[in-house]
Amino acid sequence: MTPDGRITSEFDDTAIIEPEEDDELADLELVVLDLAGTTVIDDGLVERAFARAADAAGLTATEEDRAGVVDYVRRTMGQSKASVFRGLTGDDDQAQHANAVFESAYAELVASDGVRAVPGTEDLIRLLRDAGVAVALTTGFSRATLDLVIDALGWADLADVTLSAEEAGRGRPYPDLPLTALLRTGTTAVDGVVVVGDTASDIASGIAAGAGLVVGVLTGAHDERTLLDAGADAVVDSVADLAELLGFHDEDDDFADDEDGDDDFDEFDDEDSLDDDVDSEDDSALASVEGPGGR
């Protein structure tokens, strides 16, 4: 990846900007953003809370046990925390107890250490919503923990929808979170959905939901290779780079619709708009971003 945040990998073809290509994606309607590691800086809080919960559940009697728990937690990062504990314990009651300890420990860590947004997150969300694009914040945390983080950041009115795994039905890697966000926001087609996250589970969830674009970010748990191997259409340094990837231009700090009625999200414009003169000053420099297999 280059210093300016452009994608550099063997999958670069998935993010080439080609205004002349036929656009197979619908108009952009919804961006689904993960919470910890994607829009919120984790600072190791999740892993520390998991360690406390694992100790309380008796899962770390030896150093070998502890290493195994840490490895499992890292591999399953992004999934519902309750389901992770079920995988570790194999017992529902023990998993529920461990999850309760985790939620309590995470709340204590947020209170003592604070929580910070990934730089550029708030600007991105406001930009999207000003352009008429709905935004959902989703998480594997419980609703109580989600609300704690949202309140700590002052984000009560930032996004259109906030969703926990328990409210959607199943957590990642299942498609329930993106699809529930689609229903809650009145989004009309999965092709018009972009899913963004820092873990392989986020990517798998977006793919399972049939999202038009699935993007990985490098501010959280998993690296570029892991995200691409999981099927990400593109990987960027952080959510701050998402606007450029999606075709926004900020020359005049004005992201209103073009005079001809086409919006600045030309990646998701219909075929007719792509046939317009792409050299016009009023048109954005958007790209048709297609993933492997033409999804």
Q: Which ranges hold each PLM region?
A:
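Anion (oxyanion) recognition and catalysis
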Residues: D55, R129, I207
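Short glycine/serine/threonine/alanine-rich loop segments
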Residues: L59, V133, A211-G212
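Substrate-recognition element of Asp-dependent hydrolases with the DxDx(T/V) motif
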Residues: F50, T121-L153
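N-terminal helical cap/lid subdomain that shapes the substrate entry/recognition surface
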Residues: F11-D13, E18, E24-E122, R126
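A generic secondary-structure micro-motif detector
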Residues: V40, D71, G114, A136-T139, ...
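Asp-based, Mg2+/Mn2+-dependent phosphohydrolase catalytic module
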Residues: M1-E29, R143, D147-R295
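Alpha-helical scaffold segments in soluble metabolic enzymes
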Residues: R52, G87, L127, T180, ...
